[in-house]
Amino acid sequence: QTSLVGSEMCIRDSGGSVLSADPALTSVTLVNTCLAAAAGGLSCAGLYKVFYGKADIMMFMNGVLGGLVGITAGADLMLPTSSIIIGFISGPVVFLSSSLLEKAELDDPVGAIPVHLFCGIWGTLAVGIFGSLASFDQFMIQLACVGITGVFCIVAGTIIVQLVKAVKGLRVTEEAEEAGLDISEHDGSLAYAQFQITSKKYHSGK
């Protein structure tokens, strides 16, 4: 559900962002956005099928989101064919980066880092490769933007995390972590009652 809402917002916002500047360009932007999303979902799901022999809806939806993120930087600058290529590459970016994070034992249960960080970097660089102003100079500008943005986010994020850690703390107790934060902090003991029963039955085979 979250992925569907996120996809709808990305498609709407990509088209809406150019509406006031050039209404005619809005249709091109929306078409490019949808093409990239479809290509990302198909390539990511297909790659998962090849490696694991089964379909995975979360990987498909993250591929869709990866395609949306990948095209966002240049949705109004691309030909439809370029949008398909960008989206199609975004799928493997999501799949491979998800696998790397899992092997590194970095916790990212919803795949936000592969979708937003890695596909964001790819999409930013793609403007210099496929965009209407594509050139070596433009690619280097895009690369510099990735570096500057990365440094800013790391510095700002570190400061914010350290402030939160000093004032309130970031870790919960082991008991709260074991029970789940929905229960320990939000009194959500009944929110997933049926899901827990179903999940236990599935894993026990009964």
Where would I find each of the regions flagged by the language model?
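Structural signal for the N-terminal portions of transmembrane helices
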Residues: 25, 29, 134-151
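Structural signature of hydrophobic alpha-helical transmembrane segments
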Residues: 25-38, 79-90
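Cytoplasmic-side transmembrane-helix entry/capping segments in multi-pass membrane proteins
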Residues: 54-65, 109-115
